[in-house]
Amino acid sequence: MNSCVKFLAGLACASAIVASPARAQDECNPEQNAPQFLGRAFFAVQKGIATLNNSGDPATDARTAIRLLTDPEARDRDKNVSGQAFTLGQALALLLTQSSAPVNGTRADFGFATDREQSADLYVIADSVFTVVETLIPLCADQVSAWRQGPPWVGTMNKALTALSEGKLDTAEALARRALILDRRAPYAYVVLGGAARQRLAAASAADKPRYLAESRGHLTRVLEMAQNDTSYRDVVRSSHYELGELGAASLAGAPAAERATRAREAAEHFKQYAVLAESDLQRADALQKMGDVFAEVGDTASIRAIYGGVSSNPTGYGERALLTSGILATRFGTPVEAAALYNAVLSTNPYNRDALRNQAVTLIKLNDFAGLLPISQRLTALDPNNPENWVFHAYAYAGMAERTSNAAMRRAYTDSSTKYDRMATAMPMKVTFTEFSPMEAEARIRGTIENLGTSPQTYTIIVEMLDRSGNVLATEQAQVGPVAAKATGEFTVLGKATGVAAFRYKPLL
């Protein structure tokens, strides 16, 4: 079909009607050859389609068809009204595509034979005719929908989305409303209107906030009503649930006391639906965290426990980030036993997850499980040897075991080891801290800092190994940091080009 886009596919099909008289009764198949003036108009439409398919301008043929179809002197004007309307819709769809016709002008500019000097808007005219076709020929609704969502609508929506992303809210809203003239079935215009209202909400005065909150929620709720039963809009539905959850969460601070619990539940439900539609473990973890935050805002710890409890009861149904987030919620609002089980679930999936190892170490101290703490701290220091805090876990483990043994020799040995690692942590001349670990499809980015705890400037070379879940080294990268002044901090970034990176470690700094 060459340059035929979605809505022109229907136009091209229409040109084959004459050659295909035997069609199913439930197809969009209006008569377009009689009366005579209609047949001539249909022929002009076919010529316009052929011209467009050859990268030409279909405006002349489209105007010819429109003139024939609106000529008040044409014979048998009262016959085959539905065929006339459909063919006029085709002609206007041609004008709406890559033609030289203006968007605003006089009726003469569009080929109309009546009221030629009257001002006209091509979008408004097209919408009126398309509506007539939808009413007269319901079986052609899909065809008309394709006309409505042609290049002008797509272009207008793209400009609206760009304006929204650039913060040009007046322009974005005007373009979205313009797009709604042509098509009111796709949700995208309401996405723009909801996004614009949300941006206005962020900068609004206290007096204006309720208005913009209501506007944004109204538009985004409309998006869900339009899109939630159409799988092709899955991304739109997912993002709208997230936006509505964020709006609900943001409204909690200023909400009347009687409404806070209800608003929290509504926001959490949107985040829950976002989690259901999530495309990644990271998105699902974010949703769980947001749910926890809104319930924490209103002191609903029972609901928070239900969140991480649902994950804990089905750990294989979640990825390591969602499990880790649930463990953190259990740490904050539940019991150490619950948290430990979730961190163990993370480590069964990825034994090299630094955050899970560290959080598990803290949790085992709370549980007085010092024998279990030692192997966890050993795994942690193997990954992160130049963070003094990690060696403190060794000291805690040995001190705890010393307190609990009845064997005097073992008590002395444990105490000596505890003292050794405590001194090691205190004397360490630098501290490595990580601020970002972003594993992506074909690479992983790690950012961190090195704090010089010594008394003179130092330059460091940090060598980082990217690991898979089995501990295999997938890539090795290094960064030079410094010179770093005494008691100061230097930053570093390493980027490993590898697929399947799940963790990392670095070689000890000398």
What are these regions (language model features)?
Residues L94, S165, Q199-A202, E243, ...:
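Register position in tetratricopeptide repeats
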Residues N472-G500:
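Intrinsically disordered, low-complexity Pro/Gly/Ser/Thr-rich segments with frequent PxxP/GP/PP motifs
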Residues R77-K79, P138, R184, Q228, ...:
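Short coil turns that delineate tetratricopeptide repeat
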Residues D26-F42, D76-D78, C140-N158, T231-R234, ...:
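TPR-adjacent "capping" and linker segments in tetratricopeptide-repeat scaffold/adaptor proteins
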Residues F42, G83, V154, Y188, ...:
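Start-of-helix register in tetratricopeptide repeats
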Residues G83, T87-L88, L94, N158, ...:
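Canonical tetratricopeptide repeat
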Residues K47-R63, A93-D170, A196-R238, G248-E269, ...:
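Short coil/linker segments at helix-helix boundaries
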Residues P72, V133, R178-A179, R222-V223, ...:
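Canonical positions in the second alpha-helix
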